[in-house]
C-alpha cells in the first residue's frame, strides 16, 4: 500500500479533521494520531499507522 499524505485542518475535542491531497476530508480520533499533532501538521498514513512528515 502506497503512503498517503494528510493535513490536519482542525481539532475538535478528541477528534481531528484531516484532508488528503484531493481535499477529501475525514475525521479520526486523536488517540490514533502521534502525540504533538496540531492544526497544519502533515501526516503520513502507511501500514495502517499515522506518523508526522
Residue ranges, per PLM feature:
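Glycine-centered tight beta-turn/hairpin loop motif at sheet-sheet or coil-to-beta transitions
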Residues: 1, 21-23
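Structural detector for short beta-strands of small beta-barrel domains
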Residues: 1-12
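Short aromatic-glycine-enriched beta-strand elements
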Residues: 14-17
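Beta-strand/loop nucleic-acid-binding surfaces
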Residues: 24-35
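Short, Lys/Arg- and Gly-enriched loop/turn segments at beta-strand edges
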Residues: 48-53
Amino acid at each position: 500500500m502506497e503512503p498517503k499524505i494528510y493535513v490536519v485542518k482542525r481539532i475538535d475535542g478528541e477528534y481531528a479533521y484531516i484532508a488528503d491531497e484531493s481535499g477529501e476530508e475525514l475525521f479520526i480520533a486523536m488517540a490514533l494520531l502521534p502525540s504533538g499533532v496540531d492544526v497544519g501538521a502533515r501526516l503520513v498514513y502507511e501500514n495502517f499507522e499515522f506518523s508526522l512528515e
